[in-house]
């Protein structure tokens, strides 16, 4: 029987469709799905949809709003949580511009003749990020930071023809999990390098020992670390060491921090990756975010880059024009021999980042980074005044993320703060060398002194102060 809410479920229509594709029944289409989780046609009528009747638009909206009302929102104060994405203030103009019809698509502008505006916006994104990172070539986006790390590892293997990548033991576990999945498919071994327990800096002696084995394709580091917050002062020495050993240096960065830190181009990075989320994308459960990927000017590297590249040229009449370039690297040309299987990407998010960077300019971005530094250090100072709290735990300098040691289990403290309306930190128990009492806290320009004081006072009460 035809189901009122499932299109093309009438038997005559189904039979015609099945005959056209050469199968005898709907079951043939789902043969690979375990029968225990498959909904049979006989069960369609029992689907818990609506009120036993079609709903009006107003009724549907009321139902959706009821469901959404169960969500918890953290705006005052914003969450004190980072770990790879961060609470940032997003100017209203960003959403206003990227929701224009000219931009509102995630699809690739293959037909350059009718996509000049979109392509120019992506070219501007590439140019702005290249200036920020001081790297010569930037692609038009990957999915997120994790996928960018994975692609960088695969690229390093192709360039060096080696199959081992070194990472610090405090590498963001979410980035590591995804990157390791990419690496496994490429036959790459990911190996951890020791980190100093006091400073959070990479251990140069352990790094040199591992590099001496001679099969290292790349070293990956984060600057600052997205899971400890530490700005590693050994980063340049580590980069020089891996270059001396014949490997590539991959540096993961938080882009706003680059307004006040030495950028990867000046730190000797061959490949720079990161997430554009802080550049006007806000916080969303699962995204969409923006994978940043850049390389220095080297033909070996550029030819092995993943993802779209937008270039500027002139048309047959001498007018400035934009087009996708070096497409022979890509899947729609090379298929299985492409540098990556990414095609359609996060172009809309890249345009959002371009709007944000254009709006703030160099001075505005610097002010955001400085405000984050000030607020996070204010928070660390206030927290250190609480009895039994050590903040920051690691000695290395930080900008917005920092580790804290509490006199109680960090997971328990986090749950109790959540009950009081504050989402605070990431418990670090079980991660690297941290204990169950350790937590990663994040404070950015989106927080005020009032927000920090509220956190400190509530934590004091949770700790029994």
Swiss-Prot record:
Matches recorded under HAMAP family: GcvPA
Keywords: Oxidoreductase
SUPFAM superfamilies per record: PLP-dependent transferases
Subunit structure: The glycine cleavage system is composed of four proteins: P, T, L and H. In this organism, the P 'protein' is a heterodimer of two subunits.
This protein's encoding gene: gcvPA
Domain of life: Archaea
Entry keyword annotation includes Oxidoreductase: yes
Protein name: Probable glycine dehydrogenase (decarboxylating) subunit 1
UniProt GO MF annotations: glycine dehydrogenase (decarboxylating) activity
Any one GO biological process: nucleoside metabolic process
Annotated catalysed reactions: N(6)-[(R)-lipoyl]-L-lysyl-[glycine-cleavage complex H protein] + glycine + H(+) = N(6)-[(R)-S(8)-aminomethyldihydrolipoyl]-L-lysyl-[glycine-cleavage complex H protein] + CO2
NCBIfam families: PRK00451.1 (NF001696)
Function: The glycine cleavage system catalyzes the degradation of glycine. The P protein binds the alpha-amino group of glycine through its pyridoxal phosphate cofactor; CO(2) is released and the remaining methylamine moiety is then transferred to the lipoamide cofactor of the H protein.
Organism listed in the record: Aeropyrum pernix (strain ATCC 700893 / DSM 11879 / JCM 9820 / NBRC 100138 / K1)
Signal peptide boundaries: none
Any Pfam family matching the protein: GDC-P
EC number annotated for this UniProt entry: 1.4.4.2
CDD domains hit by this protein: GDC-P
Family, similarity comment: Belongs to the GcvP family. N-terminal subunit subfamily.
């Amino acid at each position: 029987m035809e189901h009122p809410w499932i299109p093309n479920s009438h038997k005559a229509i189904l039979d015609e469709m099945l005959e056209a594709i050469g199968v005898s029944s709907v079951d043939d289409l789902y043969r690979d799905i375990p029968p225990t989780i498959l909904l049979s046609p006989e069960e369609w009528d029992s689907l818990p949809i609506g009120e036993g009747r079609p709903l009006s638009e107003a009724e549907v909206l009321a139902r959706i709003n009821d469901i959404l009302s169960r969500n918890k929102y953290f705006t005052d104060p914003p969450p004190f949580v980072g770990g790879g994405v961060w609470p940032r203030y997003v100017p209203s103009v960003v959403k206003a511009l990227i929701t224009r019809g000219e931009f509102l698509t995630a699809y690739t502008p293959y037909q350059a003749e009718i996509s000049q505006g979109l392509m120019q916006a992506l070219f501007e994104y590439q140019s702005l990020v290249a200036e920020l990172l001081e790297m010569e070539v930037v692609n038009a986006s990957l999915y997120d930071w994790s996928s960018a790390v994975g692609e960088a590892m695969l690229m390093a293997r192709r360039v060096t023809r080696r199959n081992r990548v070194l990472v610090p033991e405090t590498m963001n576990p979410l980035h590591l999990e995804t990157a390791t999945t990419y690496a496994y498919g490429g036959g790459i071994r990911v190996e951890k390098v020791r980190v100093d327990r006091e400073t959070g800096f990479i251990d140069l002696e352990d790094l040199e020992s591992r590099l001496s084995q001679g099969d290292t394709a790349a070293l990956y580091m984060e600057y600052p670390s997205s899971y400890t917050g530490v700005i590693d002062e050994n980063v340049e020495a580590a980069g020089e060491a891996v270059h001396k050993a014949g490997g590539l240096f991959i540096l993961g960065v938080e882009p706003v921090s680059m307004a006040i830190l030495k950028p990867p181009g000046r730190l000797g990075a061959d490949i720079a990756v990161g997430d554009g989320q802080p550049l006007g994308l806000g916080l969303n459960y699962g995204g969409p975010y923006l994978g940043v990927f850049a390389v220095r000017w080297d033909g070996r590297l550029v030819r092995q880059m993943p993802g779209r590249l937008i270039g500027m040229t002139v048309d047959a009449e001498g007018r400035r024009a934009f087009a996708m370039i070096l497409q022979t690297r890509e899947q729609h040309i090379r298929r299985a021999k492409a540098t990556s299987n990414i095609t359609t990407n996060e172009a809309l998010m890249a345009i959002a980042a371009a709007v944000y960077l254009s709006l703030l300019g160099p001075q505005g971005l610097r002010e955001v980074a400085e405000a984050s530094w000030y607020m996070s250090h204010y928070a660390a100072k206030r927290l250190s005044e609480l009895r039994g709290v050590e903040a920051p735990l690691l000695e290395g300098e930080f900008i917005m993320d920092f580790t804290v040691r509490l006199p109680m289990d960090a997971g328990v403290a986090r749950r109790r703060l959540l009950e009081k309306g504050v989402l605070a930190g990431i418990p670090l128990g079980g991660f690297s060398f941290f204990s169950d009492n350790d937590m990663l806290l994040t404070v950015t320009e989106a927080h005020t002194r009032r927000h920090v004081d509220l956190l400190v006072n509530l934590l004091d009460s949770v700790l029994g102060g």
